[in-house]
Amino acid sequence: MKRTTRSLFIKTLSAPALACVLVSPAALAQDSAPTFYADALPLFQKNCVACHKPNGPKVGGITAPMSLMDYDQAKLWAPMIKNALITGYMPPWGAHERHRGEFKDERYIEDNELATLVAWVDGGALQGDPADTANNSGMVAEADGGVIPDSGWWIGEPDLVVQFDRPVYVEDSIMDWQPTVQMPVPEGAHTKPKWVSKAELAPGGPWVHHIVSSHMGVGVPGRGPFSYPEGWGVLMPEDPFITVNMHYHKDPGEGTAVTDMTRAGFLFYEDGTVIDHVVETNLLPHSGWTIPPGDPNFEVNNTFEIEEDIYLLSMGPHMHYRGKAMRYEVVYPDGERETLLWVPDYDFNWQFLYEYKEPKFLPAGSVMHMSWWFDNSTQNRWNPDATAAVEYGPETTDEMANARIYYAPTTKRGIVVGGEIPADILETAQKEEQTRRERANLLDQSQDDLSWLSEDSE
């Protein structure tokens, strides 16, 4: 079976989407058919135009295919909008309904909310009177999650921007390539260690499968920026380079070559801020299994013992094209069992980082239980090859069972930004960058650098 690359770009163009929709009860009470200006546009403004706007921002390297601020475009895409809503393709969010209210930037839609936009489409996607939006001018600013600033970065104007010193060329013959590349820091821009409060990765295109870095987190399709709670942060030592592991994935063949200029932006804490919790991460990969050919519901399980009291900040499930569902659970020392995250319909193109609104306390002696399900059958239309026996591996046509977590010990460090940095924190941050650099095969297309699979999981 010939493999077809599944990219968010292709999926987005074939089934365009809304970011999320909400509607007031008054809209449902109208006797006449809903109109764009009176009913649809206010909903788009409040929940969708952060992405669906002219020259909209990239999310995981992808830009929304239409602007929902424009009536002509919204009407043109109206049938697809309806399809995206009723099929559950949008809003893009993997966490089960049971988690409503737990995570930041959640995207859920009520039945009556969906009904209003479907009614607008079924009623002929009527335009209505532009004056009907006069009282809705403030809705964008008030919407949860906000609208991307004029800077083009979700985090706002960065304190530091880094990028490759030259475009990375991904040749025609390449399907999967995982080089490690250095991003030079502009001279004089980073002369002392800084505490990162927010970090944003801007992949150069949909062929960027992932980006892994010690200081800026992980970039995968559909994932937004890292924004740490007040008093939480990551130390970025002064250095002329930031080293990143890239994974490029595309269909090989004549004319398929691409060039990448991935960027990253950082916001730093101001002097005087107190850092109580230094963020740590663990990939928690699980290997040593084989998915049989044609198996529609293959399950693997793993555990991780928590050795000290921690605050769990966020969770990031990761599988490839056969990924079907994923669950994090915890068994507390007293035997109580709790589901931390249930993703019943995993989508490789929307690999969210599920961040708690309030970091969750997990006491020492707790055990995390992770379960992954895979669909290697012909019923999975994204399956590269249902006849293959599939193992854990780095290529996109392999599979992975990773359960990355971000967390911090509960003991407060009380580190004052601009003051002395504890030796253990500085040493760890410097070692992470140096280790990544020493393991790297910098821009050597003869070899992949797969060290990221084990570096933070030992």
Task: Report each predicted region and the residues it spans.
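Glycine- and charge-enriched low-complexity intrinsically disordered segments
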Residues: 414-443
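N-terminal secretory signal peptides that target proteins for export/translocation
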Residues: 1-10
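Bacterial N-terminal signal peptides
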Residues: 11-25
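Aromatic- and Gly/Pro-enriched helix-to-coil junctions and flexible linker segments
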Residues: 28-186, 191, 198, 204, ...
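Extended, polar beta-sheet/loop recognition surfaces of beta-rich domains
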Residues: 69-89, 382-388, 411-417, 422-425
